[in-house]
Swiss-Prot record:
The gene is OARD1. Ubiquitous. Changing residue 125 to A: Abolishes enzyme activity without affecting ability to form a stable covalent adduct with the ADP-ribosylated substrate. One of its GO terms (molecular function) is purine nucleoside binding. It is found in: Nucleus, Nucleoplasm; Nucleus, Nucleolus; Chromosome. This is ADP-ribose glycohydrolase OARD1. SUPFAM superfamilies: Macro domain-like.
Length: 152
């Protein structure tokens, strides 16, 4: 059962929920970070691969770092933010920013209003959440897209 943590601070577009990301509303699109090689062999990426498959479909999109690959599953979009070249590399804030911009653009073109994600880039990738969350706020500032971040 997901429970809301300290409802979004004044003016924040991010809502924090303690619970299972995959228990989010079925109408929410999902997002997480991967590498260009689409390995998804560790962290939450393993669960995305198991739940949504489509590795070849993602590889066929030939996306590079700073771009976003997309799968459509059950009427919603699953966003794969490409933040690094290989699974063994670490992402840069610059590539994360570019891939967030690419995702925002796809969301706006396709009528996505609700987006759920983990603390992207902050698990195995070691980016700092305070920087990542500020970046998400900035990228999605002028949109009506509601973002929910799930933590365990």
């Amino acid at each position: 059962m997901a429970s809301s943590l300290n409802e979004d601070p004044e003016g924040s577009r991010i809502t924090y929920v303690k619970g299972d990301l995959f228990a989010c509303p079925k109408t929410d699109s999902l997002a997480h970070c991967i590498s260009e090689d689409c390995r998804m062999g560790a962290g939450i990426a393993v669960l995305f691969k198991k739940k949504f498959g489509g590795v070849q479909e993602l590889l066929n999109q030939q996306k590079k770092s700073g771009e976003v690959a997309v799968l459509k599953r059950d009427g919603r979009y699953i966003y794969y933010l490409i933040t690094k070249k290989r699974a063994s590399h670490k992402p840069t804030y610059e590539n994360l920013q570019k891939s967030l911009e690419a995702m925002k653009s796809h969301c706006l073109k396709n009528g996505v209003t609700d987006l759920s994600m983990p603390r992207i880039g902050c698990g195995l990738d070691r980016l700092q959440w305070e920087n990542v969350s500020a970046m998400i706020e900035e990228v999605f500032e002028a949109t009506d897209i509601k973002i929910t971040v799930y933590t365990l």
